[in-house]
Amino acid sequence: MQLNSTEISELIKKRIAQFNVVSEAQSTGTIVSVSDGIIRIHGLADVMQGEMIELPGNRYAIALNLERDSVGAVVMGPYADLAEGMTVKCTGRILEVPVGKGLLGRVVNTLGQPIDGKGEIDNDGFSPVEVIAPGVIDRQSVDQPVQTGYKAVDSMVPIGRGQRELIIGDRQTGKTSLVIDAIIAQRDSGIKCIYVAIGQKASTIANVVRKLEEHGALANTIVVVASASESAALQYLAPYSGCAMGEYFRDRGEDALIVYDDLSKQAVAYRQISLLLRRPPGREAFPGDVFYLHSRLLERAARVNAEYVERFTNGAVTGRTGSLTALPIIETQAGDVSAFVPTNVISITDGQIFLESSLFNSGIRPAVNPGISVSRVGSAAQTKVIKKLSGGIRTALAQYRELAAFAQFASDLDDATRKQLSHGQKVTELLKQKQFAPMPVSEQALVLFAAEFGYLDGVELERISSFESALLAYANSNHADFMKDLAKSGNFNDSIQQELKTIVENFKKNGAW
C-alpha cells in the first residue's frame, strides 16, 4: 500500500492533534550549606514565607528567611545526610496537620503522625498549623466555667471556657500536676483536651500518658509530643499543631481545652532557630518577634459565637457556640516573673496562677499564691454556688498573711486577732489537695460552706483533713441525690443553703472524724 503526500499530511496533522503534553512548572533550588538543622538554598525564586520545601528522602523543610539570593529553611526531622548540591523543590503548600475525633486517645508527633504504636489514625481532614485568630465580631464573652477540680483554683482564680490562663512558677512547683488534674476533671464534662509536651524528657511524657490512661482521661485527650530529643523546629511548631487540632472542635460548636507544657522551651527553640538563621538578637538574645510568637498562638484560644460556628459548618451546626481554652505554662528562674518571656505571656493572657516554691516546700499543694494569682475574666463564668461561697476565702487568706507577718514579732495578741489567725490557718489547710483527686462542684461547695459559715471553729488544725474527708463521705452516702443534683446544676438558693447547713450540722453532731 502506497500513501500519497496528502494522506501522509492528514495523518501527521491527526497525530499532532491527538498529542497531549502535561507540563508542570516547578521551582527548584540547590542546597548551598547545611548546619545545625538549618539549610541555605540558592534558587527557589517563587517560595512563600512558611512554605514546605521538599527535600530528598521524603522530608520537608520550612522556609523562614527569604533573602535576596538565598532562602533560609529549617529542616523538620533528621538532617545529617543532607549535603551541599542536593536539589530541593517548592511544594506550594503551607504545613498542615491531620485533625478530627480520630486523634482522641492517641499520642502523635508535631506533624500529627502516630507514635504510640496503635496503628494509623482515622482523621477527618487536614488543617494548616498557622491560622488567623477569630476577629472581635466572631467572639462571644466568656460565661461558662471550666472546672479544674481544685478548690484553690475554682474558688479564687476561676477559669472560663475560651479563656487563656497562664500557669507560672519555678521548676518542681506542681505546674504539670495541676494541668494533668484539670484534664482528668474533664472526663465527664464533654470538653475535649489536647496536651502539648514541648522539650520534655520522653520518660516524663510516658508517665503523663500512663496517668491519663489510669484515670480514664486519655480517651478524651490528644497528646502532641515534641520531646527534648526532637529538633528545635519540631519543638517550635508543636504548639501550633496542637492548636490546629483544638480548633477543629472549637469551630464545630464544641468545647476544647489545650495545655502548652511549656512555652518557655518553645521560646528557647525559636531563639535557637533565629540565631542560626542569623536574625538580629534582642533582649536575652531572643529575636524581636518573640512576643508575636506567643500572641498569635494564644489569640487562637477563644469562645466563638453561634453565627461563626454556623458559617464555618455551612449550616450543619446551629445555635451552638464553640470554645478553645488555653492553659500555657511558663517556667521561671528563681521566681523571676519580670524576665522577658514571662512578662510577655502575662500581658497576653487573661490572668495567671502563680505557683511558689516556698509554699510547695512547706507542704501547701497546690502551691497557689492567692495574692498575685488572678483571673481577669473567669469570675463571670464561675459556678453560682462556688461564687457565693468563696467570697470570704480570698479575704480570709489575705488577712491571715498580713497578720501572720506581725504575729512573729508580737508576744501578746488579742482574741480577735488569734481567731483570725486560726481561721486563716484552717482555710489554708482546707485548700490543700492530693494529686489525681479532682473534686466535683458539690463537694467543693460543701467544704467551702463549712469554712465560710464558721463550722471549722471547733476543729483542731491537724484534724482538718480528716474532718473534710469524713464530711464528704457522710454527704455522699446519706445525701447522694442532693450532691448529684448540685454537681449538675451548680445553682445556689435558700433551699440549697439550708440543705448544706443541715448536712454539716448533722455531721458535726455525729462527730465521727
Swiss-Prot record:
Localization annotation: Cell inner membrane
Residues in coiled coil: none
Signal peptide start-end: none
Gene Ontology cellular component annotations, sorted alphabetically: plasma membrane; proton-transporting ATP synthase complex
UniProt KW keywords: ATP synthesis, ATP-binding, Cell inner membrane, Cell membrane, CF(1), Hydrogen ion transport, Ion transport, Membrane, Nucleotide-binding, Translocase, Transport
Disulfide bonds: none
Annotated site location: Required for activity: 373
Enzyme Commission (EC) number: 7.1.2.2
Membrane topology summary: Peripheral membrane protein
Catalyzed reactions: ATP + H2O + 4 H(+)(in) = ADP + phosphate + 5 H(+)(out)
PROSITE patterns: ATPASE_ALPHA_BETA (PS00152)
Catalytic EC class: translocase
Major localization listed first in the record, in broad terms: membrane
Subunit structure: F-type ATPases have 2 components, CF(1) - the catalytic core - and CF(0) - the membrane proton channel. CF(1) has five subunits: alpha(3), beta(3), gamma(1), delta(1), epsilon(1). CF(0) has three main subunits: a(1), b(2) and c(9-12). The alpha and beta chains form an alternating ring which encloses part of the gamma chain. CF(1) is attached to CF(0) by a central stalk formed by the gamma and epsilon chains, while a peripheral stalk is formed by the delta and b chains.
PANTHER family: ATP SYNTHASE SUBUNIT ALPHA, MITOCHONDRIAL
Family, per entry: Belongs to the ATPase alpha/beta chains family.
Function summary: Produces ATP from ADP in the presence of a proton gradient across the membrane. The alpha chain is a regulatory subunit.
Name of the protein described by the UniProt record: ATP synthase subunit alpha
Organism: Haemophilus ducreyi (strain 35000HP / ATCC 700724)
